[in-house]
UniProtKB/Swiss-Prot annotation:
InterPro entries, per database record: Alpha/beta_knot_MTases, tRNA_m1G_MeTrfase_C_sf, tRNA_m1G_MeTrfase_TrmD, tRNA_m1G_MTases_N, tRNA_MeTrfase_TRMD/TRM10
Matching NCBIfam families: PRK00026.1, trmD
Gene3D superfamilies per the UniProt record, alphabetical: 3.40.1280.10, tRNA(m1g37)methyltransferase, domain 2
Subunit structure: Homodimer.
GO biological process: tRNA N1-guanine methylation
Record protein name field: tRNA (guanine-N(1)-)-methyltransferase
Length: 231
């Protein structure tokens, strides 16, 4: 699978994919990354890719022309074009799995400033996506997050298939069971005895019993629990 990134900050993208599991997956041929500097398609000597807003308003917009040229430069390798934007549909694991199943290249356009000329959204983009109800200073982080979520679903990315199958958001209604590592007791906090028993049937039963239901949007109780707890 191929990920194309149209960005003003190539080093930011390159840095993320140059270490850890991402780097190993690229070296193993699981997926590839193509980073495109949008300024190379500015069409002016100052490499400007933004301009003021028609009708007035604060800030600047990315121009449609350089974005269009950058997409055209990819030819058949453009695949699905995704604009990261606060006004996009909320990205989730189901979308990640659908994008992985499609197998097409993904081209990410990172938003900046006040956004992009609406003609980009209207004529050049297949999907407009958001990470949530908040605003980032640049769209690169959102592009990286989406690519990361899709790439780790690809065959050969994770060492153990069981790890992927057990992950929380690959199941629609449940979270993972609690997991522990050494030491078996710390600060008076103990690992459940059943997990130390070596009885695989009992361990499996405990894990199934202790899978957690997803509580969507219940962040108020999470914050309260955090505030009430001490370290």
């Amino acid at each position: 699978m191929k990920f194309n990134f149209i960005t003003l900050f190539p080093d930011k993208i390159q840095s993320y994919f140059s270490e850890g599991l991402q780097q190993k997956a690229i070296e193993s041929g699981v997926f590839s990354v193509n980073i495109i500097q949008l300024r190379n398609f500015s069409g002016n000597k100052h490499n400007r890719v933004d301009d003021t807003i028609y009708g007035g308003g604060p800030g600047m917009l990315l121009r449609v022309e350089p974005i269009h040229k950058a997409i055209l430069s990819l030819g058949e390798e453009k695949g699905i074009v995704i604009l990261t934007s606060p006004s996009g549909i909320p990205f989730n694991q189901s979308i990640a799995m659908d994008l992985k199943k499609g197998g097409k290249p993904l081209t990410f356009i990172s938003g900046y400033y006040e956004g992009v000329d609406h003609r980009v959204t209207e004529h050049l983009v297949d999907m407009e996506m958001s990470l949530g109800n908040y605003v980032l200073s640049a769209g690169d982080l959102a592009s990286i997050c989406i690519a990361d979520a899709v790439s780790r679903l690809l065959p050969g990315f994770l060492g153990a298939d069981e790890s992927l199958l057990d992950e929380s958001h690959n199941h629609p209604d449940i979270l993972e069971y609690p997991q522990f590592t050494k030491p078996s007791e710390y600060n008076g906090w103990k690992v459940p005895d059943v997990l130390l028993s070596g009885n695989h049937a009992s361990i499996l039963a405990w894990r199934e019993q202790n899978r957690k239901k997803i509580e969507r949007g219940n962040y108020e109780s999470t914050f309260k629990r955090s505030a009430d707890s001490g370290c």
